[in-house]
Amino acid sequence: MAKILIFGNSGSGKSTLAQHLCKTQGLAHLDLDTLAWKLTSPPERKPIDDSEEEIKTFISSNDKWVIEGCYTDLLKIVEQQSTEIIFMNLPIESCISNAKARPWEPHKYKTKQAQDDNLAMLIDWIGQYTERNDTFSYAAHKQFYDGYHGHKKMITQNVPTEQC
């Protein structure tokens, strides 16, 4: 049974690849953005224990799944249950281009305009990927990838999803 973790910078193609795998392999999909944050303005992270409970409910309800996000602290919760990881390690310029071309994500934003209003902040966030030292950073993602002992793949450029 496929149990796949996909991670990388914002705009790296995590959701696109996850959606493709869901369609082609019949996997259940969990976007960690949907459970990592409180519904506050400005956004605030939920306690890890709350997110962990939701993740465990998801994996216990599904035999095969793909979980995607940039949160290594949350990915570690299901690392042992996964069968494969995919590190979307695209250049920052590609991530920015992808973010600019991103279709509306109604599960994250009430309107396309709200998503577009957040774009400048997102581009800045993407650009800081290699400079940050948090759970969302390149350093954290590389450490997670290097420490994983199962099947793993690193994708370093935009490619058609069929080739992933």
Regions found by a protein language model. Name each.
Residues 10:
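The conserved Walker
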Residues 6:
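Hydrophobic anchor at the beta1->P-loop junction of P-loop NTPases
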Residues 14:
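Conserved lysine of the Walker
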Residues 24, 128-164:
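NTP-dependent small-molecule kinase module
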Residues 90-136:
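A glycine- and Lys/Arg-enriched "phosphate-lid" helix/loop adjacent to the NTP-binding pocket
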Residues 19-63:
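Conserved substrate/cofactor phosphate-moiety recognition/catalytic segment
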Residues 3:
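Walker A (P-loop) ATP-phosphate-binding motif of ABC ATPase nucleotide-binding domains
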Residues 51-96:
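Glycine-rich phosphate-binding loop used to anchor ATP phosphates in small-molecule kinases
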